[in-house]
Amino acid sequence: MRFTKMEGLGNDYVYVNCFREKVYDPEILARLVSDRHRGIGGDGLILIGSSARADFNMDIYNADGSRAEMCGNGIRCLGKYVYDHGMTEKTEFTVETQAGIKRLRCILQDGRVAAVCVDMGRPDIGAVVETAVLPDETVDFVRVSMGNPHAVVWVDDIYVCQMETLGPEMEAHPMFPNRTNVEFVQIVDEDHMRMRVWERGSGETFACGTGACAAVAAGIAAGRTRDSVKVSLLGGTLDIDYDRQNETMYMTGPAREVFEGWTDIY
């Protein structure tokens, strides 16, 4: 099986072009290829295929084999893949995901994609701050959906937020029947926030595009940030912009191809 390893701010996935490769058991394949010791290594598996409703289709599987509705860093890398590999000549195109159809705009440098801007859609924000009762403490959070579930937790310092304990406890809390992604967010000022993320099915990752959008949406709703915010993650920075007229979030960030290869792991 041929594959391509790609990353967006360190959030790395194994991509398979299903126009030329057949994948029969994606849940099993995701677990095999994501293994960083016995596999290729990554935060999950992304399958690129055809769509009757959009230019391309994206199916995402987390490192544990579970299905994901959407991935911001993953869809930026898909945009780079299909353009740089000659699968489209358009710099603006659509991708069908489990969270709906997303529109991408590729930003070129020397004829190749350097960054991608994605229309991430309308955030669905919980009406009130909720509280999760955990084994050793309670945690206040804001529930946000970007087509996938998020719990945004405000903290004073992202480096002393006990993520290794609170992340998995929040992810699997009964308040989230399908589990959730958890963002620990520190407001620097109205235009800047820092964030660490515990991703559902993958654990802590270097970045999360939908999580950054969820955090900014929660910040705007609370009156803590402006409509354009730089979100600093462990892997780098994303630019998140909220269009009030259309009530949609835009995410802009880099995408990089790491290497191509062939494996008989599957």
Where are the model-predicted features located?
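Internal active-site segments that recognize and position negatively charged phosphoryl groups
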Residues: 133-160
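C-terminal domain-closing interface element
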Residues: 123-128, 132-137, 143, 248-266
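Extended Lys/Arg-rich, glycine-bearing segments that form polyanion-binding/interaction patches
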Residues: 98-137, 144
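A glycine-rich beta-to-alpha transition motif near the start of alpha/beta enzyme domains, typified by
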Residues: 1-112, 152-266
